[in-house]
Amino acid sequence: EYSPDGKYVLFSTEVKTGEQLTDKYPAYPKANAVLTDDLMYRHWNSYEDGLSSQVFYIPYSEGKVLGKAVNIMEGSEFESPTMPFGDGEQLAWAPYNKSIYYITKQKTGMAYAVSTNTDIFHYDLITKSTTNITEGMMGYENSPAFSPDGSKLAWLSMKRDGYEADKNDLIVLDLKSGKKQNITEFWDETLAAFKWSGNGKSIYFEAGKEATYQLFELTLTDQVADLKQGKHIRQITGGDHEITGMQVTAHGLLASRNDFNRAAELYLYNQKTGEGQKMTAVNDEIYAKIRMPKIEKRWIQTSDGKKMLTWVLLPPDFDRNKKYPALLYAQGGPQSAVSPFYSYRWNLQLMASKGYVVIAPNRRGLPTFG
């Protein structure tokens, strides 16, 4: 990532931070075994190997890097971006080129394995000093992003340590006053991602709503009454689909949209009306040759008298006078709802196309229902 003035490049790369097998057994340099005597020994499909991703910056001019890269985490054994899902959104240049903000979890071994407590650290390029700006916030901090004028820093935050499915709130820090404000504290849903508006007076974000994923606008306010009543939050889009990967443009909100029957395509949404214009048609020629399942959205009464949203996918050419085998898709959660997803692994459309009635309930405890 380039600094705002284009004079530096910010990047991460792996450095040796722990003992490797060849350190213990130098006589066997070609050995590819994994020796484990402590947690954390694996992140999903990636084993702990004595290497950690750390953050560097290097001077840059006219297409060339100049001098030597500086590791702003030099001497530590911590990582940034964090495993397993951390990416470039965990790093941010301050608007005036003098500071870098990054996410890390300053724990190792067993303590690292059972904790979700990441923090945002501020590195000063002039003094080479590092400060934890979220000290005392015990949950998962993620995705720091500056307002367009550089006066505020926003990020996603979970409250509780060790609870990876906690509610994601949006925190805004006024860099001049030092005041932190949780501006979604009283909103009864969890955020997925966000972007600042062009004028910095509002924030657009993605969030779930009754097993769909939509775009919202949040107007910045100090009025406690508005915060408690949710008056500062407005839902922009609707419909039975997932909207993700949103970017703010001069012409509207550009985002990816998919549903059970259609893979992701790009849409441009009007921020005021929520109307979406389809910008790509990558798969339309293929869809024209496919008999699609019919999707039904049903609210089923549960045994305790509540309502449960359930998706039913009927096979192509479904005949209600015939009997069909059924498949029950029972997703566990609690990280995500059973939304109208298009998966290359669990593709419910493909299952229905083979002659099954697919039943996909949003069981109790899944998000997007408050």
Cite the ranges covered by each PLM segment.
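Conserved beta-propeller blade repeats
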Residues: E1-V9, Y41-D49, G75-I103, M110, ...
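Short glycine/acidic-enriched loop and turn motifs that connect beta-strands
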Residues: K16-E19, K107-M110, K159-Y163, K209-T212, ...
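Serine-hydrolase catalytic core recognition
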Residues: E48, E242-G370
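Short loop/turn segments that connect beta-strands within beta-propeller blades
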Residues: Y60-K64, D124-K128, D174-G178, T219-Q223, ...
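Short, solvent-exposed loop/turn segments that connect beta-strands within catalytic domains
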Residues: E62-L66, E164, D222-Q229, K272-G274, ...
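Predominantly a core beta-strand signature of beta-propeller blades
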Residues: K68-V70, K128-N132, G178-N182, V224-A225, ...
